[in-house]
Amino acid sequence: MAPRRTYQQEMAFLSRVSANQWIVNEGFVPNMRVPGTFYVNKHLETLMFEELQQHVDSGGHGGFLPAVKQLANVACLPGIVGKSIAMPDVHSGYGFCIGNVAAFDMSDPAAVVSPGGVGFDINCGVRVVRTNLMESDVADVKEKLAQALFDHIPVGVGSQGIIPTSAAGLESALEMGMDWSLREGYAWAEDKEHCEEYGRMLTADPNKVSARAKKRGLPQMGTLGAGNHYAEIQVVDEIFDAHAAEKMGVDAVGQVMVMIHSGSRGLGHQVATDALTEMERAMARDGIETNDRQLACARINSTEGQNYLSAMSCAANYAWVNRSSMTFLCRQAFAKMFDSTPDDLDMHVVYDVSHNIAKIEEHMVDGKLKTLLVHRKGSTRAFPPHHPLIPVDYQYTGQPVMIGGTMGTCSYILTGTQKGMDETFGSTCHGAGRARSRNNSRNKLDYAEVLENLKTKGISIRVASPKLVMEEAPESYKDVTEVVNTCHDAGISKKAVKLRPIAVVKG
């Protein structure tokens, strides 16, 4: 066995190529097929390197591998092209680090799909709904509005949905995504236009979703869940790109918006768990070897690979139904509070993006157009202006990208760029990214103090599980502004609008 490398020896494989980008050179871990790269500025890089230093000092023992090692291990997977890429909000996760983008060549029979490259919360994502209200309109009723949202949207760990459906209804929702929401009257036709994939993955096959996953999914439809999921009332704090903002219906600083961050709940988790078990068997059968057993994968064109992609598509559709149901409930709450209609309040969806998903896309690789399976885990699609897969309204601005901050910090709307398309398979960051583990947060932070800090910022908060608040406190995360600025300065996405929270509803 090769002797363990010192921290300095490990760092010799990493090279800075710009103020915001590093390359992980081949040899950092065995069997790398392509280099790795990560986007971090001076401040964010210290977190990456501290994690690596701790790993070396501990003799390689402890929890997850450091993110930079995970990034390099992904670069060893069969069929990977370009680079294994990490965004500035990177932190270690299961198999793939959070913030990882990896693309696999669909024409390569050896190319793989890995559930660890999507994550357990399939199609966890963010939707922003605009209104024509201003901060002054909601100032006096902010507490009531927070309570109304809390009352309307089922939140918390075991929360159950109030959108009535049956087992047959769930099957339809898994197959149809937002088309189901539209048919059942929970969405507007134009909502679909402003949603990635138009809110429906056509590769979904409910027969590939286990009975256990469906059993977990049925009672949770239209629920927010816990952890870092939230519904937030925000106001526009700053406009960086007036043209893009205008296209999004963002007219002025102080305008009220609603941000919904949620995913596929227990159903998505079960789909991932089921697939990992199947894929371990497939790896043994097909002789696929990885550096880390958490990188369980299967050939894209194998039965297991296709089964996973069909089931993952169902979980993605379920998450879009969830966000659509919560949009419906938000619209109801606002309409009731302001004695109006959602239409008169101009409560249109600005855009809805996923940040845990694998999708078949076309990209240029080494000067050739290739069909790739792009895994994005804790990373958001950010297609450039004139891309055929983005709505007509955004053809001149690029695709809107919703970046949720942490509880009590600002959020952003960005737009996609051509440079991002060329360098990161049209991807950018997804949020702030954890700076300390959930366990560490629970041990070091006091929830009463966290809630008090939010109140002093003038933020109304409703929380279903107060003890979980410490895990999601701003102190547990990187600074979202640093993350967004790194992407902006690197040119892989562009800042359009900054949003500030005035009320938070959390699970």
UniProtKB/Swiss-Prot annotation:
- Cofactor(s), by name: Mn(2+)
- EC assignment: the record states 6.5.1.8
Reactions the enzyme catalyzes = a 3'-end 3'-phospho-ribonucleotide-RNA + a 5'-end dephospho-ribonucleoside-RNA + GTP = a ribonucleotidyl-ribonucleotide-RNA + GMP + diphosphate; a 3'-end 2',3'-cyclophospho-ribonucleotide-RNA + a 5'-end dephospho-ribonucleoside-RNA + GTP + H2O = a ribonucleotidyl-ribonucleotide-RNA + GMP + diphosphate + H(+)
Give the note describing cofactor binding and stoichiometry: Binds 2 manganese ions per subunit.
Query: Top enzyme class of this protein?
Result: ligase
List the active site.
430
Q: Which GO terms describe its cellular component?
A: nucleus; tRNA-splicing ligase complex
Keyword annotations: GTP-binding, Ligase, Manganese, Metal-binding, Nucleotide-binding, tRNA processing
The GO terms this record gives for MF are: GTP binding; metal ion binding; RNA ligase (ATP) activity; RNA ligase (GTP) activity
Give binding positions for Mn(2+) 2: 124, 261, 355
Listed under subunit, the entry gives:
Catalytic component of the tRNA-splicing ligase complex.
Q: What else is known?
A: Ligation probably proceeds through 3 nucleotidyl transfer steps, with 2',3'-cyclic phosphate termini being hydrolyzed to 3'-P termini in a step that precedes 3'-P activation with GMP. In the first nucleotidyl transfer step, RTCB reacts with GTP to form a covalent RTCB-histidine-GMP intermediate with release of PPi; in the second step, the GMP moiety is transferred to the RNA 3'-P; in the third step, the 5'-OH from the opposite RNA strand attacks the activated 3'-P to form a 3',5'-phosphodiester bond and release GMP.
**Family statement drawn from the similarity comment of this UniProt entry:** Belongs to the RtcB family.
Record's function text: Catalytic subunit of the tRNA-splicing ligase complex that acts by directly joining spliced tRNA halves to mature-sized tRNAs by incorporating the precursor-derived splice junction phosphate into the mature tRNA as a canonical 3',5'-phosphodiester. May act as an RNA ligase with broad substrate specificity, and may function toward other RNAs.
Protein name (Swiss-Prot/TrEMBL): RNA-splicing ligase RtcB homolog
Q: Which species is this record about?
A: Micromonas pusilla (strain CCMP1545)
